[in-house]
UniProtKB/Swiss-Prot annotation:
Top EC category: hydrolase
Catalytic reactions of this protein: Exonucleolytic cleavage in the 3'- to 5'-direction to yield nucleoside 5'-phosphates
PROSITE patterns associated with the record: RIBONUCLEASE_II (PS01175), S1 (PS50126)
Domain RNB: 189-531
EC number(s) from the headed UniProt entry: 3.1.13.1
Cysteines engaged in disulfide bonds, as pairs: none
Upper classification of the organism: Bacteria, Pseudomonadati, Pseudomonadota, Gammaproteobacteria, Pasteurellales
Gene name of the encoded protein: rnb
Protein name: Exoribonuclease 2
Family the entry assigns: Belongs to the RNR ribonuclease family. RNase II subfamily.
GO BP terms in the entry: mRNA catabolic process
Job description of the protein: Involved in mRNA degradation. Hydrolyzes single-stranded polyribonucleotides processively in the 3' to 5' direction.
Main localization of the protein described in the UniProt heading: cytoplasm
Amino acid sequence: MFQDNPLLAQLKQQIHDSKEQVEGVVKSTDKAYGFLECDKKTYFIAPPSMKKVMHGDKIKATIEKQGDKEQAEPEALIEPMLTRFIAKVRFNKDKKLQVLVDHPSINQPIGAQQAKSVKEELQEGDWVVANLKTHPLRDDRFFYATINQLICRADDELAPWWVTLARHEQSRYPVRGAEPYEMLDQKTRENLTALHFVTIDSESTMDMDDALYIEPIAQNSTQTGWKLVVAIADPTAYIALDSQIEQEAKQRCFTNYLPGFNIPMLPRELSDELCSLIANETRPALVCYIETDLTGNITAKPHFVSAYVQSKAKLAYNKVSDYLEQADNAWQPEMPETAQQIHWLHQFTKARIQWRKTHSLFFKEKPDYAFVLAENGKVQEIKAEYRRIANQIVEEAMIIANICAAQFLHEQAKTGIFNTHSGFDKKFLENAHNFLMANLANEQNQTELAERYSVENLATLNGYCQMRHDIEPIESDYLELRLRRYLTFAEFKSELAPHFGLGLEGYATWTSPIRKYSDMVNHRLIKAVLAKQPYEKPQNDVLARLQEARRQNRLVERDIADWLYCRYLADKVASNAEFEAEVQDVMRAGLRVQLLENGASLFIPAATLHNNKEEIQLNPDELALYIKGERTYKIGDMVKVKLTEVKEATRSIVGEILQ
């Protein structure tokens, strides 16, 4: 009698409409229930309802009330957590194909079918790319996926590389070449092959894109300064704007440097052979003449030329550093001219380091961590590598060359691709001011610092540099690490703007055109100005792609490293391995620390820090944890930790602090 009763249907609709409706994101737990996190409140989701949703789904829900208890009932899908995703193949007990999503918070198997384009026979544990086809909240059907690509087999030792590249939709292959290569601009080059250029790089480097030559400037037999000549490989000599290689480089934007190997932006026969500044081979180059006084000030406008150059020696960072540091049994240069170049470059570098410490910003020394891999991809060891004097020689030469390129492009071309950084995010300037005052001000200097660190002052390049110089001598990294969270991101722009991170008025990279697309663009602009040819301002879509590619490459490198750290540390749990570490992040859930010996990131759950979670408070302004009202841990603290658990499946490394 009540079937199809319009009054009853209307009543049901009214009851439904009267219920509170919310939007939020689903958070799963390791139990069958979950939660819906909304802007101001979190609601319980019961186990039957959790079967309709997945961790990370953005949904609409109605709130059901029973007494003083509230729970969310999922109603509609706004945005699914999964569209394209990485997974492992699984067969259930009925031999039905399923996929297990590669995500630490999603553990339900999803039924799947193989796309016709995937010809391989899939096996348990294989890594695949899949797409979610049906979702219970959207399609009134259970979760179901299509497998579109086999990434690699379950037992592939290089899975961390292939899976991560697939996740970020990056190619594992170099760009295809286009033999034969013809030089497009031969006529306008000067012959500089007589100059004694040298390259300084890692021993294994093949894609050498910079060579250096230096000589003193003298007046009346007294040295007054330096003339540095920076020669940079010229791949645009071989690459036409309308070529396939150009289009691929424009999409990739960077050579991808991964643990163990790289994936070049250009075909290897260009990056490692034709364009690489190989010793005793004549190569096309874009060359910049730079003049400074003895204290490192630039004293003349930079002078650019297209040229042919010939590196006279391929030198290695460690050997040159050993030689300059006069280490026992150190390598010795083969030619006196090479020795002379090394010593002059060393003197120039010391002057430029001092100049940057005074006039711009100089970075605190932090090591790079290098994975030493066996043939099969197994991690043999992880080395902390510090920048030594030979690395600094190249770094200072490249920095001054990029300062000069920014000046040249701004004045001559009125455009370019500039590396910019505007310091503190405008919305955090007040926070930065308050934080500096809370940590550095006292009764004596209160008035002076209030002006020195005023919001207006911190927003200027000079004010920002002044503040950084003030905190530089402080031994702890706490101030620097906390202030870093208030900074904005670096950006590529087509007009000159300051780079607060470097403390410079302008910066435009052109010294790595084999490895960076932005540098290729700047090469073309510089060469167009020199040849008095027309040129175009770099398009916004190119700048946006550079930004996105840089972000992607960093994620790829980090994800592979996290996986390799798990493999490396897994067998060290049983031995209760202990490490010195620095606190990198402070959250309600616990601490994230970095192991100083190898760079691995470790999570310390709050439950291991104190047995009563009600007595643990997070101070988000200080990035500090308070226990029983006392500040106990803050970002930048040095702690001793031990490993307690490594899970390769979720790439998580867990530890605890040794009191």
